[in-house]
Amino acid sequence: MKRQAEATKRKHQVSSDAPPAKRRSEISSVLAKKASDKETQRTFKGSTHKTFPPKKYLDSIGNGRQEEKPCIKTSSLFKNNPEIPELHSTVVKQAREQVFSPEAFQELDLHPHLISTINTVLKMSSMTSVQKQSIPVLLEGRDALVRSQTGSGKTLAYCVPVVQSLQALTSKIQRSDGPYALVLVPTRELALQSFDTVQKLLKPFTWIVPGVLMGGEKRKSEKARLRKGINILISTPGRLVDHIKSTKNLHFNRIRWLIVDEADRILDLGFEKDITVILNAVNAECQKRQNVLLSATLTEGVTRLVDISLHNPVSISVLDKNCNQPNPKEVASIQLNSFAIPESLDQHVVLVPSKLRLVCLAAFILQKCKFEKNQKMIVFFSSCELVEFHYSLFLHTLLCHSGTPTSEHLPSASWPLKFLRLHGNMEQEERTSVFHEFSHSETGVLLCTDVASRGLDLPQVTWIVQYSAPSSPAEYIHRIGRTARIGCHGSSLLILAPSEAEYVNSLASHKINVGEIKMEDILAVLAKDDCFKRRQRGAQKSRASGPQEIRERATVLQTVFEDYVHSSQRMVSWAKKALQSFIRAYATYPKELKSIFHVRALHLGHVAKSFGLRDAPRNLSVSAVKKASLKRPHPRRKTQRKQHLVPAEVLHSEHSSGLEGGATKCRKQGKQQGLQVAPSKPGPWRE
């Protein structure tokens, strides 16, 4: 009894010495927070994130209104990252071409009205080097294989001879005669661009009618135009093959010109069979004609096409300053490992850990397009899903933070951001609208797939950013070729992970030099904008400075992205789909680059961070994605897919005729090449 009384007394003493209940609650809260922070740091591998109770904060307008907002603990962007290696690439002598020549168009034997149109409408007086070498040869009626750097004026090099020869025919061309010239191009956008150039050249010669055929347009309308008559026909291969098989009014008995522009790209996209069908159809009705093949790069596939389409051709290469080469095969084999790059093009590379890729890309866009005047940028991605995801993400985050500058370090004004997108899953009407809008815009950021990498002349593009590394040096050349066109200055940036640094040496082996930009220099732009300054409790600004401040602002920007992605289950699902698309595209690099871009080298948790995901999806693993991407479709279900095509599938590929699903076409091409291609896997062009 006595012991029980003493125990009760000690209990009351402890109780009387303890702090009040409110104080005890605060102490326990602080201890719990510290324990939570330690646990989060200890278990961080992209899998543990703590959610804190709601707290009050002042809104951005500053009107004193208080709201409840959950504070989510995000893992550090600057911890557990792989070490960034030093680049020790060998400096090589790049192949150069002289873009302009001193000769003017007046020196050529052209119709005076055609020369006047070139000078006044196209605003060109002097020829480029490739035009100087090509136009006289083509006016002589010779077949030709033309190779020159991107942006050197190859389109005009064949358009001028075609218009000159057709207007000079003694018997005046009638619209009802049908095609006299056939031009094949790989993409719809290039078809529109070539059609626009021909249309301008034909202003003095109204009796010659140009026309364009491409997937995505109404086949009935195209049949009506063919019935009325088209004298210069520009088309994508898939659509033309469809009309050859189904349109009775399409005849080639008067064909005098057959031109294949971007010949290597047409073959890369699997159109070799379509080209064979077209050549057979033309040969069946007209044996005598002039054939021209053009491209910025020559491949082994082009040499095969030379064998079946050209007769005693002239090889024109500005790079080697050789004309009238007797054997185009030898020229092609010599030039396979070297590429001509415009002298006015500056090339850069930056090594960025996977977790920081998204923040680094956003910071670079802000640096060039918000804080610098008259900047126009194209960002290349590996798939349509990546384009759509980043377009939506930047549209709802960066635009909301690109208002009036508040920092004293800002220039007198910042420039509004404008985002556009272009890829093969868009409807043709929207693609055409975006193409024209970006072409006529002075500023803007175009997010796109490789559909925009070939032949397109997009004026005043100052920066090319390759967020997804190209699958070949030739693809790299065509991407950066969208800038520094016709003597203008331009720059390019290639974003690589530390494990991909060896790709720089791969480019150097093809005589391509790139200079390194440090990631810290790109992220430093965030110090110019107080929108990304971290705020502590009580709406007090962080007092950090230097590198620490930049890290804090990068974390704030990453938090903005993650908050948007996790704002709805739909966005989370969209981010996961984009992540899966990225990994599948990553698995399609050719075998010679597998040692650099191997899917097993990816840290899925870190890669997920670059998609605004706080956790790597549990049902996503490297082996699962690889297995799904290589899985062959069930033979019994193949027929059902053909019978139940939805409208979205009809317009799946920018290169198709528009009458069959892109996935079905990929599978057909895969069978011809002995490959196993799944419906959801990106094609060999990874668009």
Swiss-Prot record:
GO aspect biological process, one term: ribosome biogenesis
Keyword ATP-binding: yes
Principal place of residence: nucleus
EC annotation from Swiss-Prot or TrEMBL: 5.6.2.-, 3.6.4.13
Residue numbers spanned by region Disordered: 1-63, 625-687
Keyword Hydrolase: yes
Sequence ranges of Basic residues compositional bias: 628-644
Reaction equations catalysed: ATP + H2O = ADP + phosphate + H(+)
Function text: May have DNA helicase activity and RNA helicase activity. Probably have ssDNA and RNA dependent ATPase activity. Plays a role in ribosome biogenesis and TP53/p53 regulation through its interaction with NPM1.
Name of protein: ATP-dependent DNA helicase DDX31
Lineage of producing organism: Eukaryota, Metazoa, Chordata, Craniata, Vertebrata
